[in-house]
Amino acid sequence: MTYDPIALLSHGLIDLPWWGYVVVTLALTHVTIASVTIFLHRAQAHRALDLHPVVSHFFRFWLWLTTGMVTKEWVAIHRKHHAKVETEDDPHSPQTRGIDTVMWKGAELYRAESKNHETLEKYGRGTPDDWMERNIYTRFSWHGVGLMLAVNLALFGPIGATIWAVQMAWIPFWAAGVVNGLGHYWGYRNFASADTSTNLVPWGFVIGGEELHNNHHAYGSSAKFSSRWWEFDLGWTYIRILAFLRLATVRKVAPKLHLENAKPTPDLTTLHAVITHRYEVATSYGRELKALLAAELGKLRERAQRGEIKPVEVPSIWRLRRWLATEPAALPAPERARLSAMLAASKPLAKVYAMREELSGVWARSTESSEQLLARLQDWCRRAEGSGIEALARFSFQLKRYA
């Protein structure tokens, strides 16, 4: 077989129609997405699954070719993000660094933190440290992307450079920008985790399931990111296929909430279930009180219009429920100020918010014994049922069904 040198220069070894190059680009970038979410994120950073050595090394090699990222660096930075989430020490929180910075300069934040030796030593333990990792993937971390460019040019000609450029931008935009930025700024929340994480959309196709960021922050060690029947995690689908082929072993998934007939009073089983599902509890609290919250917000607006109280910036019911489902420290300062002003103007809202804070104290007081925490939960339920607020009584009844 002979090759025309001019043809090789114009379209490389493989000549495709325009849409063929689009398909190739999407396929290559999707393998990179799968490598990040399955290998780097779920297997390495959170130990949610074990991968067969062949699969693991394929992912390592592919990430070396397409991103230049070092496994230890990525894992350490991500673990630090979870440990220091929404604080000044969080490597990429839009709450402290600004959404524009994280969205468009996320890769720069990653590179800066990767030079922090303390971060790598403290949070990067347990990552691959074999000969290939030390002498190839880490020592020549950026040579892989150069090899990828050469391969693309040989296969596709000049258009290969465009494909390569898209490959280089894919993870910095979708992972470092969209997930780390928008995933803590915009979207919906299933769980009231102690941060501002959100689910971007219910269907995790484009970023392999990483779109379900709030679910992940609620149960960080779970190999499965979807939690509601209408949600879809493509990364989990791949993991199940690998497990079926005996190429992966799932170590942990998020626990499922079990309900039984309500008990007269909470017991230790109830307590443990409440602590395990604490983020679900906090979210359900706002959902159960939705009608009460809406009614009180309406009263605030009417009183402000009549001049009975100082005008307050009354939030939407959606925003108020989100405030109830977020720890105060995780709220931006302007929103905390709005919340304080609103609570000062409404005793019922102040009451339900204070009860919410007391309930979260049940799982926040790690130094107390189980018996002490159980006494707190039992007391909370008694006061909720005797508060005269029907929604609180209903919620207490619901808690006593936890098992």
Predicted regions and their residues:
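Non-catalytic, topology-defining segments of multipass membrane proteins
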Residues: 1-178, 222-403
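Alpha-helical architecture
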Residues: 39-40, 80, 170, 182-185, ...
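A cytosolic-side transmembrane-helix exit/cap motif
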Residues: 43-44, 181-191
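Active-site-proximal inter-transmembrane loops
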Residues: 124-131, 186-212, 216-219
